[in-house]
């Protein structure tokens, strides 16, 4: 539809004035925006990357990962850091819980010598550090562990038993307004780990909620609900956890998908096991009886042996991964594998915990 010539001149003059006052790029036509194609970082899980629709977590955005205790929240974020470091990116870990284990992080592939770490005294200090790192433009991934541990200064300086209703929610709301723009400008990914609480007196529906008020729910581009759904056993020994992640919010692709994978103790996400399963599903890896083969070459009898073979042959594993991603990420409009029922999602509440 043609625009009146006088209107075009007026629009050009207005845009010129805005750019002169606020800088080049402060206003543009959406099709000219170079950042439309969202850059992503792998989560360390191939099935979760595919469930996210864009191939990983989006740069320049806020992501929330929540779930019960020992569900794999910190492990997942450490795998994201390891993946980012392999791409040469700089990462920071804001350890508000004062519980980061460097030995475990190293086992997951994190380069702890180049990982920035802070253990802030107050919630305000933690969020100011996040903002300073984002504004620097030199840090690519920031992880905050966790929102529940971001204690307002007034609460720390007060006495146990004092009422501080709404302080944490107000602190988070103010921080989100400040952080969102800075993260976009510096293309920094900020991941918040969050805990689950129970609302008192809920007779019907899901009593679960997350801490820190509602601001994070709104500002997050991606929200992941992670749960432990079973145990991985070798004989009688439990060697890991079966884990399910639901994408309950997604602003970069279709939401409401899910991924299931194994987290092995001391090793992290069983990436090569996922590769075998997805390779068979997409008919890239042939399975005849107990034998697995790729391009006519047998790679192992049983899934465990096939997984070991892929670990020992990273070039072939990379080739299979590339083909799986091309097949499954090319169809962005595919029907979600799983839709989160309203009764299952974590409820929102104005209560502050």
Curated annotation (Swiss-Prot):
Source organism superkingdom: Bacteria
- Please indicate if the UniProt record lists Nucleus as a keyword: no
What are the record keywords, sorted?
ATP-binding, Cytoplasm, DNA damage, DNA recombination, DNA repair, DNA-binding, Nucleotide-binding, SOS response
Predominantly, its location class is: cytoplasm
Q: Which InterPro entries does the protein's record reference?
A: AAA+_ATPase, DNA_recomb/repair_RecA, DNA_recomb/repair_RecA_CS, P-loop_NTPase, RecA-like_C, RecA-like_N, RecA_ATP-bd, RecA_C_sf
Please tell me whether the keyword DNA damage is annotated for this protein.
yes
Q: Name one GO cellular component term.
A: cytosol
Instruction: Give this protein's Gene Ontology molecular function annotations.
Output: ATP binding; ATP hydrolysis activity; ATP-dependent DNA damage sensor activity; damaged DNA binding; single-stranded DNA binding
The compartments listed are: Cytoplasm
GO biological process annotation, one example: DNA recombination
Tell me which residues bind ATP: 67-74
Similarity remark: Belongs to the RecA family.
Q: What does this protein do?
A: Can catalyze the hydrolysis of ATP in the presence of single-stranded DNA, the ATP-dependent uptake of single-stranded DNA by duplex DNA, and the ATP-dependent hybridization of homologous single-stranded DNAs. It interacts with LexA causing its activation and leading to its autocatalytic cleavage.
HAMAP family for the chain = RecA
Record-given protein name: Protein RecA
Q: Which organism is it from?
A: Salmonella paratyphi A (strain ATCC 9150 / SARB42)
Q: What is the lineage of its organism?
A: Bacteria, Pseudomonadati, Pseudomonadota, Gammaproteobacteria, Enterobacterales
Q: Which gene encodes it?
A: recA
């Amino acid at each position: 539809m043609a625009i009146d010539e006088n209107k075009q001149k007026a629009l050009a003059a207005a845009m010129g004035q805005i750019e002169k006052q606020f800088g080049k790029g402060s206003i543009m036509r959406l099709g000219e925006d170079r950042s439309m194609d969202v850059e992503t970082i792998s989560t360390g899980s191939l099935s979760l990357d595919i469930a996210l629709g864009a191939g990983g977590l989006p740069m320049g955005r806020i992501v929330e990962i929540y779930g019960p205790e020992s569900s794999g929240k910190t492990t997942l974020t450490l795998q994201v850091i390891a993946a980012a470091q392999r791409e040469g990116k700089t990462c920071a870990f804001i350890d508000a819980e004062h519980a980061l284990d460097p030995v475990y992080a190293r086992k997951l592939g994190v380069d702890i010598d180049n990982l920035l770490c802070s253990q802030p005294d107050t919630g305000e200090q933690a969020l100011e550090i996040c903002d300073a790192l984002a504004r620097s433009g030199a840090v690519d991934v920031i992880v905050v562990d966790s929102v529940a541990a971001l204690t307002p200064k007034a609460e720390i300086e007060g006495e146990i038993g004092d009422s501080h209703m709404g302080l944490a929610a107000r602190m988070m709301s103010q921080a989100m307004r400040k952080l969102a723009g800075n993260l976009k400008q510096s293309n920094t990914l900020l991941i918040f780990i969050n805990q689950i609480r129970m609302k008192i007196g809920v007779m019907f529906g899901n009593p679960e909620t997350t801490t820190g008020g509602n601001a994070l729910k709104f500002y997050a581009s991606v929200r992941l609900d992670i749960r432990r759904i079973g145990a991985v056993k070798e004989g009688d020994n439990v060697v890991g956890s079966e884990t399910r992640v639901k994408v309950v919010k997604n602003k970069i692709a279709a939401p409401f998908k899910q991924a299931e994978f194994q987290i092995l103790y001391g090793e992290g996400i069983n990436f090569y096991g996922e590769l075998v399963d997805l390779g068979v599903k997409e008919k890239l890896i042939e399975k005849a009886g107990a034998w697995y083969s790729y391009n006519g070459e047998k790679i192992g009898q049983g899934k465990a042996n096939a997984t070991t073979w892929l670990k020992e042959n990273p070039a072939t594993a990379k080739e299979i991964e590339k083909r799986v991603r091309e097949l499954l990420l090319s169809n962005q409009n595919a029907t979600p594998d799983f839709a989160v029922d309203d009764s299952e999602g974590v409820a929102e509440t104005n209560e502050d915990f």
